Amino acid sequence: MLNALLVTLILSASMAGCLESDEDEKVIRIAFKTQDDYDNPSANPQTLADFIAAQSGYAVELYPINSNIAAIEALRFGHADIAFLDGGAAWIAWQQHDFSAILADQKSDGTTSYTAQAWVLADSDIQSLEDLEGKDSCHTGWLKSAGMLMPMGYMINNGIVDVSGDADDISSLRTTIEEHLGNASIPESGDLYYSYSGAFRCMTEGVGDVAFGKTTSYEDHCEGNDWCLERDQYRPLEPAFGQVPSHPVMVNTETTSQEKIDVIVEAFLTLNTAEGGAEILDGVLNTPGISEVTTEGHLGSYSDAIGAIPGIAAYFDEKYDE
């Protein structure tokens, strides 16, 4: 009898950490980086909290955090219902803790992602991703999403490129690039060929045979640049490498009920249309809009690619713990 009572007490205690109390159920807690003072009042996240409270009928509290890891831990232990994370941190939250993406901020064109793709000159003998072996490459920088992680991860995941070195060490990626490709331009900030426009210029000026960028690289970076050629002088390589996600809103479904999640989604979507919403989107969230997403739809192809990068999980753990 005593043993049965002890088991019941232990189970009750463990369940208490997983289920919301009635009091918690009517409160939405948002993990957010905060500061003591705001020179620009429109950047104060309290305006977001007040808006969501008015739209949802729930009390809304800001749970202060200072890093992506702190936000993940807040979700993990039920201190917050939602958190805004960048793509890498969201991937960690999904893969290590099974958190879900429910919303994502929009880019200037209204989408919630951009597509990573390789470009070559139109007269290049490179016709496929398999033809890149031994070719000189132009990257946007070290460990950049579309300029390195997506293309290399995609090709590793699809058996086009083999990992050289320790599969658990991120530095093996550089060795892998050097072993499979020819000379690689991997610039640092401030270098001539750094960033998306730099990688495209690197390929245009013949420093490399291929540039790793986005499907929109020509439209984004050639207007007004005299180093660019005409559009018909370039050719994107197929297939593309997948979608790089915008910042999602993540939730832990083990500690936040589906009923509350539905309320959160509906309230946040009204930011797109309600009076005052545009100012909060711009000032607090730095986005023109917000969209409802699913975890697989938003993070799926990104996960497939970067998950194949040697040592990426340990790298992200260290990066976000800083």
Region locations from a protein language model:
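Secretory targeting signatures
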Residues: M1-E25
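An extracytoplasmic/periplasmic, membrane-proximal ligand-sensing/linker region
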Residues: E25-F32, D36-T47, T256-E322
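Bilobed "Venus flytrap"/periplasmic-binding protein-like clamshell domains
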Residues: E25-Q55, I65, T112-F200
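Periplasmic-binding protein-like
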Residues: R29-Q35, L103-V120, G165-P187, H221-V265, ...
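Solvent-exposed loop/turn segments at secondary-structure junctions
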Residues: Q35-D37, A89-W91, S108-D109, S124-I126, ...
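Hydrophobic residues within well-ordered alpha-helices
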Residues: L75-R76, L132, M203-T204
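N-terminal segment of the mature folded domain
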Residues: R76-K107, T111-T115
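A ligand-binding cleft/hinge motif common to bilobed small-molecule-binding domains
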Residues: F84-H97, Y154-N157, Y196-D232
